[in-house]
Design a protein with these regions (language model features):
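Conserved glycine-rich cofactor-binding loop
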Residues: 31-32
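Conserved mid-core segment of classical short-chain dehydrogenase/reductases
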Residues: 87, 110-125, 168-171
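Catalytic Tyr-X3-Lys loop
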Residues: 117-136, 155, 179
Length: 267
């Protein structure tokens, strides 16, 4: 049966999904930036992609690109802030494949950029949901198609903010620190079922997140000028270059490396 590039989040469509011929990699935040670059790199290396993003328009464009390289690649529109969306996406993935080669938990937001005293509580919680809770929720729901006879490799995208406190970034720092520990816990618990998990800090990448940082102000973010200067000085790294550096770890890290945190600048 023919399969449309984009899947709507409705269970009624599941009966029409043919199984993928090759094991896919699931990439969240795959519609742009680093996630899109990682997904394309994986497709070019011969892996079908299940690309996830909340931006349906950008995801459609990215998905067409991936499908041109690997015909089995598909897209699923899913907002990781919405737990019902996550549940529906997981069901669609399980209907599409009996085993996942890997998951790249790339989706993330930097907002809100505000002090702990002044930040909107709902926005702070939304950051934690997308950057951390959504990772656990999606992975938990996909456990039936992870590991087993073959190793499933899970990669989380870390940040220097996971290691140090940054004024104005409390939600992001907390979420990324939690994500590093989540990867360690996943590695510990997944070992007996051939599931590995690592975290990788990609450095300062030229993405929309950097634009969001530069659109903030010094009152909310004391390090504002530092990031403006990094952009002016051409210090931001192209996502395609970073994706190429991360690729071997994403697809080839060993069970012995599971639980480790890597920094792209040290690879």
């Amino acid at each position: 049966l023919a399969f449309p590039l984009a899947i709507n989040n409705t269970k009624s469509r599941l009966q029409y999904l043919p199984l993928m011929l090759k094991a896919p990699y699931v990439v969240t935040g795959a519609s742009r930036g680093l996630g899109r670059a990682i997904a394309r790199n994986l497709a070019e290396c011969g892996h079908p992609i299940i690309a996830i993003s909340r931006d349906a328009v950008s995801l459609g464009l990215a998905g067409a690109e991936f499908a041109d390289i690997q015909a089995d690649s598909i897209t699923i529109t899913c907002d990781l802030a919405d737990r019902a969306d996550i549940a529906a996406a997981a069901e669609q993935i399980k209907a599409k494949t009996g085993w996942i080669a890997g998951i790249i938990h790339n989706a993330g937001i930097i907002s809100p950029i505000k002090s702990i005293a002044e930040v909107d509580r709902a926005n702070w919680a939304r950051n934690i949901q997308i950057n951390l809770v959504g990772v656990q929720d999606l992975t938990n729901r996909l456990m039936p198609v992870l590991g087993g006879e073959k190793q499933t490799r899970i990669t989380t995208i870390s940040s220097g903010a996971s290691l140090r406190a940054i004024s104005g970034w409390s939600a992001y720092c907390v979420a990324k620190a939690g994500l590093d520990m989540w990867a360690k816990c996943m590695a510990e618990e997944g070992a007996e079922n051939n599931i590995s998990a690592i975290s990788i800090a990609p450095g300062i990448v030229d993405t929309d997140m950097q634009k969001t940082i530069r659109s903030s102000n010094e009152d909310d973010f004391p390090d504002y000028e530092t990031f403006v200067e990094l952009h002016k000085d051409g210090q931001l790294v192209n996502p395609k270059l970073v994706a190429g550096q991360l690729g071997p770890l994403i697809t080839g890290h060993s069970m012995e490396q599971s639980g480790m945190r890597f920094d792209v600048r040290e690879l």
